[in-house]
């Protein structure tokens, strides 16, 4: 009897590790860029497949970035030092208009993706690519689809349309056939990311922004890993993918607290220090003995400043344009003014009847469950039914109810005008902004106390 012995050599398939460092909702906070750059460089010394993603909202929040001569340029210069590989646009990227956004994209070494951002012919902004591919040395191809929230100020981008991100993503299901790993790089918020994962199982990972959510270990929805890393560059996200035979066999996420890191990239930190040293933002222009406890107190100050600047009876400011939730007692600097409101919206003067003012307020409430229009010159009460629907708005000034037959001078910024005054005759646009009005107001009122100020009431019928 003959026995044949067959030898089988088992070749174990090698695995590849991919690391994606991500940031979202930085809003001009540049102080930790030195630490981030050092951290990324250390990872790249350890392994070859390290990428850096930006999930939107680079600007609006720090005057050294927002008020630079070339608006937004400092943060792009710092990003290029890291460097970033892929970016999606946040809604705030559109706040400086189409031409400035185009200049920032041209300045950046990062690839910008935005599948649902559509530019009309003649726009200074040119369509970004909807997606891009990253290829590993083993041949694995990673597809990255970009999606952006539609909550920008449409009046600033008349030639750009931002269409529904989830519906748009569904049109790119075929992208999965062209890559082995598929990532959505989004600025649509955690809830929308969850909806996207539910409706479209093609994504292995969604790297998100917009809602400023901290997801310490990420969340799994429909087998998709959803990540987000807070805001203001306090953290970076670290997504790790384990790939075997060109397919993901493991994925995980952690948030890295940059404030706990000690190593700093010297070149990047010198650039950060250069920008932070800008002297004009350190000038003290006022003080507040009790501070501001909430947005309404800050918004009331801003509305008073707008009313004074435009010489009107009534003025409104929007909660979206108050970037601080509260403000401590003490000095107020020029930098603080541009942090409280970082938008540079022009101020507009209208002549409105009480009925038209009610319509303005009612429209604003339909977009939010809470009052969002802070006011000067009057108080108003929202009268709601048990379902929370506004049935009436009462308006009073210091003399009592407004005269229904009179037109009042009313001031507001272009954001409020664009969203709630579409069907009204255009107002008179001025060169003033909320920031300049605040600076002028503090020249005449260097000490401001708005503690306990409340001009809005809600009454249930």
Residue positions per predicted region:
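General secondary-structure edge motif
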Residues: 1-2, 58-59, 156, 221, ...
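Bacterial Sec-dependent N-terminal signal peptides
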Residues: 1-16
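Short, motif-level signal for alpha-helix interfacial/capping segments enriched in acidic residues
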Residues: 2, 6, 34-35, 188, ...
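Acidic, metal/ion-coordinating pockets
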Residues: 14-264, 297-305, 351, 366-373, ...
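Catalytic centers of hydrolytic enzymes
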Residues: 16, 23, 29, 45, ...
């Amino acid at each position: 009897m003959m026995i044949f012995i067959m030898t089988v050599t088992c070749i174990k398939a090698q695995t590849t590790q991919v690391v994606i460092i991500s940031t979202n909702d930085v809003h001009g906070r540049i102080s930790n860029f030195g630490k981030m750059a050092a951290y990324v460089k250390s990872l790249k010394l350890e392994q070859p497949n390290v990428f850096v993603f930006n999930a939107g909202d680079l600007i609006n929040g720090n005057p050294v970035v927002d008020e630079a001569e070339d608006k937004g340029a400092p943060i792009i210069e710092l990003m290029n030092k890291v460097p970033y590989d892929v970016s999606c646009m946040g809604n705030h990227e559109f706040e400086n208009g189409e031409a400035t956004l185009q200049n920032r994209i041209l300045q950046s070494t990062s690839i910008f993706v935005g599948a649902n951002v559509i530019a009309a012919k003649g726009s200074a902004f040119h369509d970004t690519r909807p997606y891009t591919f990253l290829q590993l040395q083993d041949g694995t191809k990673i597809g990255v689809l970009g999606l952006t929230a539609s909550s920008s100020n449409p009046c600033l981008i008349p030639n750009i349309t931002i269409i529904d991100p989830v519906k748009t993503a569904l049109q790119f299901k075929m992208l999965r056939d062209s890559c082995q790993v598929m990532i959505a790089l989004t600025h649509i918020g955690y809830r929308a990311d969850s909806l996207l994962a539910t409706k479209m199982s093609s994504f292995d990972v969604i790297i998100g922004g917009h809602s400023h959510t901290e997801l310490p270990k990420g969340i799994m929805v429909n087998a998709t890993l959803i990540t987000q890393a807070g805001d203001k560059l306090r953290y970076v996200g670290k997504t790790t993918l384990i790939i075997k035979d060109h397919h993901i066999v493991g994925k995980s996420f952690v948030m890295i607290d940059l404030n706990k890191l000690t190593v700093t990239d010297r070149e990047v930190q010198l650039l950060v220090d250069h920008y932070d040293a800008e002297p004009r933002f350190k000038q003290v222009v006022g003080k507040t003995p009790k501070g501001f406890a909430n947005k309404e107190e800050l918004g009331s100050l801003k509305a008073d400043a707008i009313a004074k600047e435009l010489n009107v009876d009534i003025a409104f400011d929007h909660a979206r344009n108050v970037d601080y939730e509260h403000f401590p007692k003490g000095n107020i600097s020029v930098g603080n003014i541009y942090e409280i409101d970082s938008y540079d919206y022009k101020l507009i003067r209208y002549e409105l009847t009480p009925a038209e003012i009610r319509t303005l307020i009612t429209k604003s409430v339909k977009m939010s469950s809470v009052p969002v229009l802070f006011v000067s010159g009057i108080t108003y009460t929202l009268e709601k039914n048990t379902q929370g629907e506004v049935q009436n708005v009462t308006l009073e000034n210091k003399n009592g109810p407004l005269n229904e037959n009179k037109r009042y001078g009313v001031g507001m910024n272009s954001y409020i005008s664009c969203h709630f005054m579409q069907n009204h005759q255009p107002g008179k646009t001025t060169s003033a902004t909320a920031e300049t009005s605040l600076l002028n107001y503090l020249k005449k009122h260097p000490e401001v106390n708005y503690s306990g100020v409340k001009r809005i009431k809600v009454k249930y019928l």
